[in-house]
Design a protein with these regions (language model features):
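Glycan-recognition and catalytic cores of secretory/periplasmic carbohydrate-active enzymes
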Residues: 1-351
Length: 351
């Protein structure tokens, strides 16, 4: 599998061990749906086997990103081929994800040892891990999965979404009272800014949350989150890595635009006609900007979408620069998904 991001424009490879291989398999499934060519189906099914083997090895699975891993790979594979192996792997991953649930605070703990006070928190990215639980509830009839997904969504809506429509990346919770302690950032510029990719997760995550729950409040949060994102775009419609920036030389994050476009397309059936037209136009502008400014030329080992950011250091966060102005797997995947959503009557892998 490709590593999470390119280095000097080229992906290195490793076994199925990081949080991102599901996006690569998802791209194989998208390519299969677009072309009907068996080479993509065969490759994707071979990769599904590696996801099942990873569960047996218990290889780096003690975190919340099981949805990113198993939805675009195994859930998609089951839907497209009826593969029993894909279904079983996805159900096992969903069962493991429930073990991250913290009843005190009602959220899925993102990282670290369960009940570690230093890691007692949720992050906005996890909204895209919840579809695995909704799918498992549908498949098994076990309400435990949907109850956890619903509870986490409600907590995220309360503690990660600000009144102005911007979002926090992460929020620490009190393990005794379950109340929020403080909202912080891990990969954004600073705690009170809006990390662009996190904002995009919020857009797509709330659009999906509304699909699953039909809660009007989640559609309103989608609207506010999308409006904030769109008003912070520079003239070329490719967002900076943090939305605190609207001009200058800071790196752009093309992956945030791709994810946000998918969120806007996802919400279209839920919107009144005039609003639907505006949302479609906004999504089209984002997608056009990616095609014009970020689409990668064909290159062995290269990515699909240039100018992404994995981590960007700032005076206020603790990350080091990694994958800055490079392609990354989630950007490549969601760019392909956005193109698919725009050009086909496509059933999403996420719902």
């Amino acid at each position: 599998f490709p590593l999470p991001c390119t280095r000097n424009g080229v992906y290195s490879t490793d076994i199925n061990t990081d949080w991102t291989p599901g996006f690569y398999t998802g791209m194989c499934w998208l390519a299969y749906e677009a072309t009907g060519e068996e080479v993509f189906r065969t490759a994707a099914l071979q990769q599904v086997d590696s996801f099942a083997e990873r569960l047996v090895r218990n290889e780096n699975l003690d975190h919340h990103d099981l949805g990113f891993l198993y939805t675009p790979s195994c859930v998609a594979g089951y839907r497209l081929t009826g593969s029993t192996a894909a279904r079983n792997a996805a159900l096992e991953a969903a069962a493991r994800l429930t073990k991250r649930y913290q009843p005190i605070g009602q959220f899925l703990q993102a990282w670290g040892q369960i009940n570690d006070r230093k890691e007692y928190r949720l992050i906005i990215d996890c909204l895209l891990n919840l579809p695995l639980l909704w799918w498992a509830a549908e498949q098994t009839g076990d309400p435990r999965y949907s109850k956890i997904a619903r509870a986490h969504t409600a907590t995220a809506a309360k503690v990660l979404f600000r009144p102005d429509g911007s979002t926090s990346h992460t929020c620490y919770m009190d393990p005794v009272t379950g109340k929020p302690v403080c909202a912080m950032t891990a990969q954004g510029y600073r705690a009170d800014s809006a990390w662009a990719r996190g904002q995009a997760w919020g857009i797509l995550g709330m659009a999906l949350a509304y699909r699953f729950t039909h809660e009007p409040a989640y559609l309103e949060q989608f609207r506010a989150c999308a409006a904030f994102f769109l008003k912070r775009l520079p003239e070329d419609n490719v967002p900076y890595w943090d939305l605190i920036f609207t001009e200058g030389d800071e790196p752009r994050d093309s992956s945030a635009a791709a994810i946000a476009a998918c969120g806007l397309y996802e919400a279209l059936p839920c919107l009144p006609e005039a609003e639907r037209t505006a949302a479609q136009q906004a999504a089209d502008r984002l997608l056009t900007a990616l095609v014009e400014h970020c689409a990668a030329p064909k290159r062995p080992g290269g990515g699909v979408l240039l100018h992404g950011v994995y981590c960007k250091a700032s005076p206020y966060n603790t990350v080091t620069n990694y994958g800055v102005d490079e392609a990354n797997l989630w950007g490549d995947y969601f760019y392909m998904e956005a193109l698919t959503r725009r050009t086909r009557n496509w059933r999403t892998y996420w719902a």
